[in-house]
From Swiss-Prot:
Region span, G5: 174-176
Residues that hold GTP according to the record: 19-26, 81-85, 136-139
Alphabetized PANTHER family for the sequence: ELONGATION FACTOR TU, MITOCHONDRIAL (PTHR43721:SF22), ELONGATION FACTOR TU-RELATED (PTHR43721)
Protein name: Elongation factor Tu 2
Record region (G4): 136-139
Membrane-crossing segments per the record: none
Domain tr-type G span(s) in chain numbering: 10-206
């Protein structure tokens, strides 16, 4: 019998803690690294190190985010935790740290609070596929019935936001006790139970290369005697020489054949997610294709002009607008590689949006862009970023 090969290629999953301020998100993050470090599955990261998270820029927006990593027997996890409420909102909207699943932390002493709701709603809008709940501070509640009540309330709340409230795993425990007693079987049990829950309940993300082919067009050249080449970075999937591709967005969708793929002036058989390539397109004129369009597997993406989106508008101190905007606001929406002008309509009852706010809007673009729910964009005025958004629903 041949010896089984050691596999170091565990599936990689991105998770993050969300929930109301002071409910224990950062303590839980520290506790996970502390408890897992007893078995060599993480290196311990101190609460204060997570709390003074470094700032990073994503789509022109500064966000403080702490990253830790750990592994279970089955998976490798990258875990994000944000110090401030505004950082969470910015993070979820810009996708700075894309989450395959979220750990919602709720203090049993408080139950669901305003930010609990806001984070669940955002997770729904930005397309976080699954969530597990860690009921924290259970040691501070004497009455088990109270804890059960909090859990029932939360399951209903999850249902309200279209997460399957009955199926979502709930783990009861105390992050602080686990952090302080990582070797104590009883006190650390909640952390191991949480790991088991995320392992089994959060679905493994489909790898970029397994998704249908898509490449945003960054530049177009014509090569005499060979035809037209579109260059860009393959966002997802694989393009093989000889395959049909659709040119989508801005104009009517056109189908053509990719007759060559080159990278660093070498001819290849295929281009894969992450590669910067030039795709040679049969029978396409230089003026038929432009930046802002995408090459995609035919039938997998369509152009649209109207959509609903969740947006974060930069504050004045972040280099954003100094004044509010109103219904009918006309900024540019920067999708992938290009700016498109659009008109914003605000929800009923909202008169204006102040710098630093987050808001759900309907937007109408003047030219159609290849899009699907989950696509992120920047909101710009004359080349300056004033906000960020993510499409929550396509209208037409």
């Amino acid at each position: 019998m041949s010896k089984e090969k050691f596999e170091r290629t565990k599936p990689h999953v991105n998770v993050g803690t969300i929930g109301h301020i002071d409910h224990g998100k950062t303590t839980l993050t520290a506790a996970i690294t502390r408890v897992l470090s007893t078995k060599g599955q993480a290196s311990f990261t101190d609460f204060s190190d997570i709390d003074k998270a470094p700032e990073e820029k994503e789509r022109g927006i500064t966000i403080a985010t702490a990253h830790v990593e750990y592994e279970t027997v089955n998976r490798h996890y990258a875990h994000v935790d944000c110090p401030g409420h505004a950082d969470y909102i910015k993070n979820m909207i810009t996708g700075a740290a894309q989450m395959d699943g979220a750990i919602l932390v709720v203090a049993a002493t408080d139950g669901a609070m305003p930010q609990t709701r806001e984070h669940i709603l955002l997770a729904r809008q930005v397309g976080v596929p699954a969530m597990v709940v860690f009921l924290n501070k259970c040691d501070m509640v004497d009455d088990d019935e109270l804890i059960e009540l909090v859990e029932m309330e939360l399951r209903e709340l999850l249902d309200d936001y279209e997460f399957p409230g009955d199926d979502v795993p709930f783990i009861h425990g105390s992050a602080l006790l686990a952090l302080e007693n990582p070797e104590d079987e009883d006190k650390a049990a909640c952390i191991w139970a949480l790991m088991e829950a995320i392992d089994s309940y959060i679905p493994e993300p489909e790898r970029d290369v397994d998704q249908p082919f898509l490449m945003p067009v960054e530049d177009v050249f014509s090569i005499s005697g060979r035809g037209t080449v579109a260059t860009g970075r393959v966002e997802r999937g694989i393009i093989k020489v000889g395959e049909e591709v659709a040119i989508v967005g801005v104009k009517d969708t056109v189908k053509t054949t990719c007759t060559g793929v080159e990278m660093f002036r070498k001819l290849l058989d295929e281009g894969r997610a992450g590669d910067n390539i030039g795709a040679l397109l049969r029978g396409v004129k230089r003026e038929d294709i432009e930046r802002g369009q995408v090459l995609a597997k035919p039938g997998t993406i369509t152009p649209h002009t109207k959509f609903k989106a969740e947006c974060y508008i930069l504050g004045k101190d972040e280099g954003g607008r100094h004044t509010p905007f109103f219904n009918g606001y006309r900024p540019q929406f920067y999708f992938r590689t290009t700016d498109v002008t659009g008109v914003v309509s605000l929800p009923e009852g909202i008169e204006m949006v102040m710098p630093g706010d987050n808001v759900s809007v309907d937007a109408t673009l003047i030219t159609p862009i290849a899009m699907d729910a989950g696509l992120r964009f920047a909101i710009r005025e004359g080349g300056r970023t004033v906000g960020a958004g993510v499409i929550s629903e396509i209208i037409e």
